[in-house]
Design a protein with these regions (language model features):
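Active-site metal-binding loops of divalent metal-dependent hydrolases
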Residues: 134, 192, 217
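Solvent-exposed segments in extracellular or luminal domains encompassing
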Residues: 374-378
């Protein structure tokens, strides 16, 4: 019996470690991603928390930016029937990395070789994400040679998974560099927000003739939004964001599925970036926000029976955010919000939690870690 159990354990371990094969296939009208020989359109989210909820909304894949928790994320994804775009965090010039320093570049490549060797046979692995926004505020195009060396190692040692690299938005210069210097990149990936509508037309125009993915997308970025007269960007409310998620997916992602292999919505989790609510699909207390309803609708194709309330109006002192609200600190002012429930939905009581938070003084770029702004109490 003991011998039989040992053999069975070895068999299960072997089965678990067999890689699923992902391929990019040229079709009569574009490209298709296939997993184990079957079409696989990526309906993904950027982030790896609440995987049961990811499955519940009809998503099929998660994206990471680095490998700090790779084993845990891959294993949990496998248990939940999800795949993983595993990010290899290639160092940024803007953080001090010198791509003219061959010793440092070689050490980085050697590290990623060990990572690739370790995880290449995991059954939840879908795609290798070789670098994220290495083009942001950079001056040295040698970074693309480093991207190519990593991607080539993937192709040399892992026949089962394609490679992608991710740029901050889409422009002709980076498309030209990747086309010329990175022949082992299979898929071009773009992080894009308000400019997402230009991607389908621009990507071929800029010289990339292969497939692409949208690896971050969501509301308008804080750099793309209207500002107050004192220069602070105005965040969309959750209802406005829900409409944006729905329309951008339907019009610019799904509609171009002959060349766009899918997407990863940003951000599945909570994050302080300009504000604590701008990009996160969950509050810092892990409460889901209204845009998740939009993702469930587009991923499943079904209308929700119990969606979140719609915000009709939100005002302070009878003014909305775009009115450049100025209030005296010693005054007392009314704040009002009007919501609407979907048909056949009723609630006995709505709870409102009002918070006043100072404007952030730790605003950075590229998603770098920011300190939370101070909440005003009393």
């Amino acid at each position: 019996m003991t011998k039989q159990l040992i053999i069975l354990s070895l068999f299960l371990l072997t089965v678990f470690s067999v890689a699923a094969q992902t391929k990019v296939v040229k079709t009569s009208n574009g490209f298709e991603l296939q997993r184990n020989g079957k079409p696989y359109y990526i309906k993904g989210v950027g982030g790896d928390v609440n995987m049961e909820k990811i499955v519940a909304i009809g998503a099929n894949s998660v994206r990471t930016w680095g490998v700090e928790r790779a084993q845990e994320v891959l294993d949990e994804a496998q248990r939940n029937g999800l795949t993983v775009m595993l990010g290899l965090w290639v160092q940024h010039e803007r953080h001090g990395f010198d791509y003219n320093n061959q010793d440092k570049v070689a050490k980085q490549l050697a590290y990623f070789k060990t990572v690739i060797d370790r995880f290449k046979n995991h059954p939840a692995l879908l795609i290798w994400g070789v670098g994220n926004e290495v083009d942001l505020n950079y001056t040295n195009p040698n970074v693309w040679n480093a991207i190519q060396d990593i991607a080539k190692y993937v192709h040399d040692t892992d026949p089962n998974h394609p490679t992608t690299t991710v740029t901050a938005g889409l422009d002709s210069l980076e498309a030209a560099f990747i086309t010329a210097r990175c022949p082992d990149i299979d898929i071009y990936s773009i992080n894009t927000y308000g400019d997402i509508g230009n991607v389908p037309n621009h990507i071929a125009k800029f010289g990339w003739n292969g497939p692409y993915m949208i690896t971050e997308w969501g509301p308008n970025g804080h750099w793309e939004s209207p500002q107050t007269k004192w220069g602070v960007s105005i965040e969309q409310n959750s209802t406005e964001k829900k409409e944006v998620y729905f329309n951008r997916y339907k019009n610019y992602i799904e509609k171009n599925s002959n060349t766009c292999l899918g997407s990863y919505a940003f951000l599945w989790g909570a994050k302080q970036e300009y504000t604590e609510t701008w990009y996160g699909l969950f509050s810092k207390n892990n409460i889901p926000t209204e845009p998740i309803d939009a993702l469930e609708e587009v991923f499943t194709g079904n209308a929700l029976t119990n969606p979140a309330p719609t915000i009709l109006n939100f005002q302070v002192d009878q003014q909305k955010a775009t009115d450049n609200i100025e209030l005296k600190s010693s005054g007392i002012f009314d704040a009002n919000i009007n919501i609407q429930l979907a048909e056949n939905v009723s609630i006995e009581k709505a709870n409102y939690n009002w918070r006043i938070i100072e404007e952030s003084t730790d605003k950075k770029s590229g998603g770098d870690v920011e300190d939370a702004a101070t909440e005003i109490t009393g």
